[in-house]
Structures are given as C-alpha cells and as structure tokens.
Amino acid sequence: MTSNYADMKVGRWDITDLVKDPSSGEFSQFLGSIEEQVMQFEESRKILRPDISHEEFERLILMLENISEKISVASGYAYLGYYADTSSNEASALVIKMEKLASEVSNRVLFFDLWFKKEIDHDNASRLISAIPVMYREHLRHKRLVAKYSLSEQEEKVISTLEVTGSRALVKIYDKMTSSFEFTAKLRHGRKMIMKRFDNKEKLMSLVRSPDADRREAAYKSLLQVYKKNSGVLGEIYQNIIMQWRDEAISMRGYRSPISVRNIANNLDDITVEALLAACRKNVSIFHEYFVEKSRMLGMKKLHRYHLYAPISKKAADSKKFSYGSAVETVLNSFENFDPQFRSLAERVFAKRHVDSEIRKAKRGGAFCYSVTPNLTPYILLNFDGLSRDVSTLAHEFGHAIHSMLASEMPLMVFHAPLPLA
C-alpha cells in the first residue's frame, strides 16, 4: 500500500482476513471446530463443584474464550459484509445464520456462567477470583454482583433464542428500510430551482451544514418527509424494541428502571448517572445562550431546527471541502504529533485495508469502529463526504481503533471498552 496518503481515495474494506469464502469447505470446517469445542466444554458440567481447583477453573475460562473468539470472527465477517450492503440477501442470510449459531452456542455454555454467578458459595468464588490472572478479577467480581438479575437456565435460553427473531430481527428490518430510503430536495441552482435526488442519507445530510440557509432547510424537509411517510412502520419497530427491553429488564429480571440495565452493564450505579443528568438539566440555560448567540451571528431572529449545524460564515471550516487523502494525512500527522505510536497503529488499519469510507446506496449510515478480537486489526466504517466533521469523525473512529490495538494483550472477555470509557 502506498504511504502517499494525500492521494488516497475513498474505498471499501477487505474482510477476507476474517473469512476467505463463507461458501467454502474451509469455513465449514471452521464452524465444525466450534461445535467440537462446545461439545468438549459441555463435558465440564460434571466437574463444576465448589472446591474446583483454580487451575481447572482457569482452563474452563480459556476454553470459553477460545470458543467466543471463533464465534466473534464468524459473526464479524457476517456483520461487516451486511453493513457494507444492507440490500444483499446473501449477507442478510449469513447474519441470521451466525446469530442463530451464536445463540445456540451461548445456550449450550450458559450453565458455566450461571454456576459461577448463583451456585458457588461466596468463599469459594473469592478463592477462585483471587487465584485467577489479575485481568479477569474485576470482570468476575462484577458477574457475582449482577447475579440477582439472572434467571433460570431454561428461561435464559428462551430469551436468547427469541432475540434472534425478535429485537435483533427488528433492528435488521429498520436498517434495511432506512438504508434503502431515497430523498428528493428542491434546491436553487443559479436562478433555477431543481429537484435533486439522493440515494443515500449521508449525502443529503451534508447539506445541513451548508452555508446556504435554503439548502439546509430543503435538506431537513426532504429527510423528514421520507421518515414521516414511513412513520407507521418505523414507530412499530421502536415501540416493540422498547417494550421488549422493558418487559425483560423490569418485569422478568427485576431491574429498577430501563436505564439501570445499561448503568449496571457499564459498572456504574444509578446515583452517579442521575447526578450527571441532574447537572445537565440544571445548566440547560448554557445551551439556550449558545443558540441565541449563534442566531445573532447568523443574522436570524430565531434559530429554527434547520440551522442548528449552520456554519457561522462562508469562510467557516464547515464550508470547506476536504479530499479524503488530505483528511487522512491531517489526522495521521496529528496522531504523530501526539505520539508516533498512534500514527503507526492507525497506519496499520489502512495497510490492512480495514476501512470502508465511500458513500454508496444501501451501505449503513454513520460511522463506527468494529473490534473483532484482540489479535485482529479493527475495522472502521465511514461515510466520507469531505466536510470538516468527516475529518473529525475519521480521527474519532481511529481513536477507538488505536485504543483496541493498545489493549490487544488483554483477553477477549475484558478486551472491549465499556461505553463510558469508549
């Protein structure tokens, strides 16, 4: 790969590092190896007793991690292929297949998790935790703390099985729908008004940062018109996902509130998060003052929703267009100024061709960094359109990738950063 980043163009990622060909015999053998390891792990149920040795306990954790890594590789390939083209029936079918496999494997090894959470006594659990390598200890302590929210093995299996065709299926339907949306905006072109068609939301939303107020308004109206037209179906998707979340978390598991589920998963207590929210509510006037001042700088009596992201002048950064190559070069130089290792790690992502940066129809919108396993270079999805916010998004997602690579010596069980840290 060339090191002349200034000439780099947007492109697609290469996910063959994960799976060369999902229809090949090699991939079938890979999935078969997962089945063999799961069967071996299932045999460990008979040796789970309070006085199990810490060596045996650690061996089981390592077996479980090995199974999880293989599932992550197969699932990662399926998801990344689907995000690159949500209209692909082949990609969608593979996602369903991998989700079903992951659910089945999870159900078959679930007994170990529930045993450690609920069946072993406090003294023996503490003995095992203190003898295990230090990187696992906090994770295992947290499992014991949240044990009261676990259900019986059979109940957990039912929930896991139904998720594949329940909330996860609804999310895929949402992605397929919204990624296929097409938009038409009425824009001024010289003295004429033209109807411009957009087959991707990302291109349309670039206009909300246009220095032209009419273009910003036209972009929002076009966006909202399409979503309003589909509000019935989208509303049903939202409602059903929310109801499923609440029914499981509150009615079945006994969490105090829906947000408590997320807080506890992030190892935070509700009081801490509520203090943060209370501080935001108390100081909401600061945001009001900001928008009043922005309205004044834009020469508007009132700042409408259409103009929240308006650049304050035609010379502002959001009015400037950046080539992809110059954006990459700017970010890499910034990383190097902070620490040469940051640049080196970011360059590895480009060298591996793990970036999908172009805007195209049916590709998932937004941006993310996807870390599959600790020993694999992360993947980054962008929708680069040349705005300053696209440059900052590039830097942001590569920051996640650098974080993942710096954590590559950690085991999969504790490798991923929790949301508050990420």
Regions found by a protein language model. Name each.
Residues 1-316:
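A well-structured
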Residues 62-65, 242-243, 350, 354-363:
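Conserved oxyanion/phosphate-binding beta-strand-loop segments in alpha/beta enzyme cores
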Residues 293, 297-340, 369, 380, ...:
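Long, K/E/R/D-enriched contiguous segments that form extended
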Residues 317-322, 356-376:
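Catalytic zinc-binding patch centered on the HExxH motif and its immediate surroundings
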Residues 319-324, 375-395, 409:
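Short pre-active-site segment immediately N-terminal to the catalytic Zn-binding motif
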Residues 343, 349-353, 422:
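Acidic/histidine-enriched, beta-strand-rich ligand/metal-binding domains
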Residues 393-397, 401, 405:
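Catalytic glutamate of the conserved HExxH
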Residues 404-422:
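Post-HEXXH active-site segment of zinc metalloproteases
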